[in-house]
Amino acid sequence: MPRQARLDSPGTLHHVMVRGIEKRPIVNDETDRKDFVRRLGALAEETQTPIYAWALMSNHVHILLCSGALGLAKFMRRLLTGYAVSYNLRHRRHGHVFQNRYKSIVCDGDNYFTELVRYIHLNPLRVELVKDLKELENYPYCGHGTILGTPARQWQDCESVLAQFGTRTSEGRLPTVRTKIVRSLVENYGVAVAEIARQVGISTSGVLKILTRTLSI
């Protein structure tokens, strides 16, 4: 179960949420988005901080990570400060880009881990940044596509996520992860089977077969 973060020790699983100041956008265009993702990846590699899931939205960002030796506070400070300086210079503005304090929840339990991965990676679909699951699989500002194998990002820890979803092989990525996503959409978000069939590009009977599989949620 989640609880409010009181720890900043290495090896702690955190769901981090950062919002723009006064709910304003934190990215204005593709250059901003690419810059934020580049900084996240470079810092994750430099500090050996595992990133399991992430989604960059218009006015906030979700990151599921395991704090490394640097600790969460210093990691987030470097990420947000570096990006804010670059953002302000590029857009010729001054002042805060993010709310003063990011929100962090310490997470326990394998079941909650997989649900968080689904929740975070479904955000672009939920707010209609993408129109369907096919677009989500190719959306470059969310970690979902990387888990499925495209695009490859060395800094995103896909193997740990795939292990929780029940596979480690490249061949097993798409059917296993897609199955879990489809079940999550039906059971947690009430999306109609016919609509999921349209989004995924398979038949209604195919969706129903997915829903009757004995994979754990």
Segments and roles (model prediction):
Residues 1-53, 57-58, 66-217:
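Short Pro-Cys-Gly-centered "Cys-loop" motif that presents a nucleophilic cysteine in a tight turn
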